[in-house]
Every structure is written in structure tokens, then in C-alpha cells.
């Protein structure tokens, strides 16, 4: 069952996850990460057989709705006074485009750890290890939050949560191998 509270969607909350509608509060947690699944794409699942990293013509890309949603996410975060210390993205075009549309004035850091490993791409174990190690470092050292634009499979493996396109999970490393889910948001919808 989906309940709407302002700008937040609460879906399948695990026990112990706070549900108050405060993205600002969640991201104030030192070392927090906003794990955002790329915005809405054209129809399809995965990527075409002739997929090549770095060649957007061979990938499933953002739809016009997705492009508008990414811009709206960025404007909403700005309106809330939330500016990430860094923005990292999967190297897939749909993720890079989501990040660039959200944060046109920030440097976007492509990061292999956020790449999809669906359909046999990448190295799931190595990528998850990199992401978990970086999140643990951020929890120890970072006073701010980062935005990581990635894919459903990565977010699910890191948090145990499923996200729709354009939906985000606010999380923080809880030990070396796990993420504590702070909350989830569907953005300005």
C-alpha cells in the first residue's frame, strides 16, 4: 500500500526505519548518501544487446518525462537548501544525464561502483565492496551528504529496498558491510 505524506512516498517500510517526512533531517546525518535511481527512461528493460558504455545511442536513455523529473529533483533540493558535497554517478548515460540535469553547476563524478551489473555487466561483488567502503569512509569523515545516481539493482543490494525510477533512498553506512536506511523520497512529485 502506498501512502502519500507531502513529498514523500512510504512503501514497504522495514521495522526501525524512521518515517517522518524530513529529507533535510535525513541528509543532515554525517556521511549520509542519497541513493537515487536514475529518472524515467524510454520503455524497456535493461539495455539493448549492442550496448556499449560511453555510447548513448546503444543504451536505454531518459524519456522527456525523466529529463523533466531530474530537473525538478534538482530544483527541489535547491529549494530545500540541500547541496551535496559530491555527486557521483554510474557511467550509464541515463544516470549521468539524471545527475547533470539535477546539478548543472556541479561536477559529476562517474564511478564504476555505481554501474549496473544487470545482464552480466560489471563485477557485482567488487562494485558493492567499493560502494560500501566509500560509504563507511564518508560516515567517519564527511560532514555533509553525497548524491549517488545509480540503478535499481545497486540500490537494492546496498539497502535491501526496491526503488522506482526517479525515487531515492537516504542512507548511511552502518558498519563496513551494511547501510542503515534513513528514509525514502519520490522527490517533488
Regions found by a protein language model. Name each.
Residues 2-17:
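N-terminal export signals
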Residues 31-33, 144-150:
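Generic beta-sheet signal
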Residues 121-130:
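Short, surface-exposed amphipathic charged segments that create phosphate/polyanion-binding patches used
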Residues 133-136:
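Membrane-proximal amphipathic alpha-helices
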